[in-house]
Amino acid sequence: MPAPPFNGVYVTATGAFYPGEPVDNDQIDDYVAPLNGGSSRLKRRILAENGIKQRYYSTGPSGETRFSAARMAAEAVRACLGGAGITSEQVDMLCTGTSGGDASLPGFANMVQGEL
């Protein structure tokens, strides 16, 4: 069965959210423990080849959660709405997709809606 056409559906804005302060390559071990003594050599090689200079973590250095997945999604939605110049009251449907949310129940979309 063919999919129905999406006439009149357009992407008019996108949003992004980066949790916390950027963590550079020298600070990674403060957030992610090394696997073993030899892992630092492998880490240096991977970091040199992948070109990534900094990243963002939703957890703090001691492993505490600073930003839930639902909160990060809600912040990205807010950025998207701002970019589109609309309010959440003007949105008819919220669809989400994730490989794993913060909890099994309620569903991730409900969690994001609650954050909004």
Residue spans for each PLM region:
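Conserved "HGTGT" condensation-loop signature of ketosynthase/thiolase-family condensing enzymes
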Residues: 1-93, 114-116
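Short Gly/Thr/Asp-enriched flexible loops that form oxyanion-binding sites at enzyme active sites
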Residues: 100-113
